Amino acid sequence: MNRVLCAPAAGAVRALRLIGRTSRSLHPLPGSRDRAHPAAEEQDDPDRPTEFSSSKANPRRWSVGHSMGKGHQRPWWKVLPLSCFLVALIIWCYLREESEADQWLRQVWGEVPEPSDRSEEPETPAAYRART
């Protein structure tokens, strides 16, 4: 049974190798020109896609400095209000009192309420069960 399954796969691999040797590559080497299209025709044909290697977006030509400038920084009046708002929101979330929405979420998520101080004493059975 194993030989039956492997034979078609091996034949397909051999066929792909033969096709690869006889056909030319779909990706020409960089710097080589396609003989079917002269250089003047490449630039004039608007329907032909732009080659990435010759475009200005090529990483060899483009850098962040070209887009934003060498010493670009965001102005403080854009950064400071957002930073202050986020800090105030985090402080409010930490310091606010528990609401009905918090109790509902705790019930939905199935969390157990925090134990009271007296159940944390080592001699109580509730504290013993919580540790094991």
Swiss-Prot record:
Basic and acidic residues composition bias: residue spans: 32-50
Q: Which GO terms describe its biological process?
A: mitochondrial respiratory chain complex III assembly
Give the UniProt subcellular location, in the record's own words. Mitochondrion inner membrane
Q: Which Pfam families match?
A: CCSMST1 (PF15013)
Membrane: is it a keyword of this entry?
Answer: yes
Region Disordered: list its residue ranges: 24-73, 110-132
Main location, first listed in the record: mitochondrion
Q: Indicate yes or no for the key word Transport.
A: yes
Lineage, uppermost ranks: Eukaryota, Metazoa, Chordata, Craniata, Vertebrata
Q: Which residues cross the membrane?
A: 79-95
- InterPro entries found in the cross-reference section: UQCC4, UQCC4_vert
The UniProt function text for this chain reads: Required for the assembly and stability of the mitochondrial ubiquinol-cytochrome c reductase complex (complex III (CIII) or cytochrome b-c1 complex), a multisubunit transmembrane complex that is part of the mitochondrial electron transport chain (ETC) which drives oxidative phosphorylation.
What kind of membrane protein is this, topologically?
Answer: Single-pass type I membrane protein
Q: What is this protein called?
A: Ubiquinol-cytochrome c reductase complex assembly factor 4
* Signal peptide stretch: 1-15
| Assembly and interaction partners | Forms a complex, named COMB/coordinator of mitochondrial CYTB biogenesis, composed of UQCC1, UQCC2, UQCC4, UQCC5 and UQCC6; stabilizes nascent cytochrome b/MT-CYB and promotes its membrane insertion. Forms a complex, named COMA, composed of UQCC1, UQCC2 and UQCC4; activates MT-CYB translation. Forms a complex, named COMC, composed of UQCC1, UQCC2; UQCC3 and UQCC4; mediates MT-CYB hemylation and association with the first nuclear-encoded complex III subunit UQCRQ. Complexes COMA and COMB are bound to the mitochondrion inner membrane by UQCC4.
| Alphabetically ordered keywords of this record | Electron transport, Membrane, Mitochondrion, Mitochondrion inner membrane, Respiratory chain, Signal, Transmembrane, Transmembrane helix, Transport
Kindly report every residue range on the membrane side named Mitochondrial intermembrane: 96-132
Which GO cellular component terms, listed alphabetically, does the Swiss-Prot or TrEMBL entry include?
mitochondrial inner membrane
Family, per entry: Belongs to the UQCC4 family.
Segments on the Mitochondrial matrix face: 16-78
